[in-house]
Amino acid sequence: MSFNFRIGQGYDVHAFGPGDHVMLGGVRVAHSHGVLAHSDGDVVLHALCDAMLGALALGDIGRHFPPSDARWKDADSAQFLQHCDGLLRERGWRVGNADITVICERPKVGPHAVAMRERIADLLAIELDAVSVKATTSEQLGFTGRGEGIAAQAAVLLGRIAAPHQ
């Protein structure tokens, strides 16, 4: 049986390290720390990539962009998202909507949420109202609550747009 919809979910986390900003949803956000990562460490785009890949059982971001590969050192995660979107479209799918939650005490995400939504919608060539970005804290519990890092969760609904390219 074949369905015209697929659901995927993704999660990413990075510890804070030296730096003066974090990348979130393709947007540079000033912060007292950067993140420790092989690429730019954008937890929003990484979680979104994993959700998209998972919906079609295509593995995870680490398989497609292994940290052992020097090509991805300090890479812009927008490249990852566009690659994942290309894989979906090659198979006749596209993102119907994405729902993303950032988990951290700081930086405050709210002031940047619209810019993140706009960037993601632009990268995926979907409507702005198909992208939700929100934030929560962990009430000072765990590594995010202690200000040691940042995490993101993403859920996507994919819709079939065409038969897969042969």
From Swiss-Prot:
Gene name for this UniProt entry: ispF
Protein name per the record: 2-C-methyl-D-erythritol 2,4-cyclodiphosphate synthase
One GO-annotated biological process of the protein: terpenoid biosynthetic process
Summary of the function given for this chain in its UniProt record: Involved in the biosynthesis of isopentenyl diphosphate (IPP) and dimethylallyl diphosphate (DMAPP), two major building blocks of isoprenoid compounds. Catalyzes the conversion of 4-diphosphocytidyl-2-C-methyl-D-erythritol 2-phosphate (CDP-ME2P) to 2-C-methyl-D-erythritol 2,4-cyclodiphosphate (ME-CPP) with a corresponding release of cytidine 5-monophosphate (CMP).
Taxonomic lineage from the root: Bacteria, Pseudomonadati, Pseudomonadota, Gammaproteobacteria, Lysobacterales
Cofactor: a divalent metal cation
Domain of life: Bacteria
Species, as recorded: Xanthomonas axonopodis pv. citri (strain 306)
Free-text cofactor note: Binds 1 divalent metal cation per subunit.
HAMAP family: IspF
